[in-house]
Design a protein with these regions (language model features):
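Amphipathic alpha-helical
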Residues: 1-8
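Conserved N-terminal beta-strand and adjoining loop/helix that marks the start
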Residues: 8-38
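Active-site segment of metal-dependent pyrophosphate-handling enzymes
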Residues: 25-27, 71, 75-113
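Conserved hydrophobic/aromatic beta-strand scaffold that supports enzyme active sites
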Residues: 30, 40, 102-106, 124
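Conserved Nudix-box catalytic region and its N-terminal flanking loop in Nudix hydrolases
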Residues: 33, 37-81
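Short aromatic/basic micro-patch
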Residues: 54, 99, 123-124
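NUDIX/MutT-family hydrolases
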Residues: 106-146
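Generic C-terminal helix-cap and adjacent flexible tail
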Residues: 147-151
Length: 151
């Protein structure tokens, strides 16, 4: 074989060093209304994690604060205005093709009727109802922190 002929059979086959995974910061809003219900949305069927439920949010843009990101994403994707409050938790999660950091803040709904502008549907639910909806694995720690904060 070529490696033996070259005098170094342990050097072959040569592989490139693994490339670092892309990293993104995601701002997430856990939005409460006046009835202490939470807003969740269902991801579109096509694409990664299709059909699962999630807390709304999106990618942090360059030069943007996480609070601004959350407010912007909820306006763009759901058509609502919120007041972004305290940070609840930060969750790092790795997929096979990228690493994500979810920075999660508690939010208060201010105005706008939530619309599924970038999802299948949106729903207000009681915290104890969250267990009835399938969420991505990365959301388990968010739900745990949320329920723990509610006592």
């Amino acid at each position: 074989c070529a490696a033996y002929a070259a005098g170094d059979p342990t050097h072959w086959p040569m592989t490139d060093a693994p490339k670092p995974l892309p990293f993104q910061v995601i701002g997430v809003g856990v939005v409460f209304n006046a009835q202490d219900e939470l807003l969740i949305d269902q991801r579109l069927e096509e694409g990664l994690l299709g059909g699962l439920w999630e807390f709304p949010g999106g990618k942090l843009e360059e030069g943007e604060t996480i609070e601004t990101c959350i407010a912007r994403e909820l306006q763009e994707e759901l058509g609502i205005a919120v007041t972004v409050g305290a940070e609840l938790i930060t969750v790092d999660h790795a997929y096979s093709h990228k690493k994500l950091r979810f920075v999660v803040h508690l939010c208060t709904w201010v105005s706008g009727d939530p619309q599924p502008l970038a999802s299948q549907q949106v729903r207000w639910v009681r915290p104890e109802e969250l267990k009835n909806f399938p969420f991505p694995a990365a959301n388990a720690r968010i739900i745990e922190a949320l329920l723990g904060s509610l006592g």
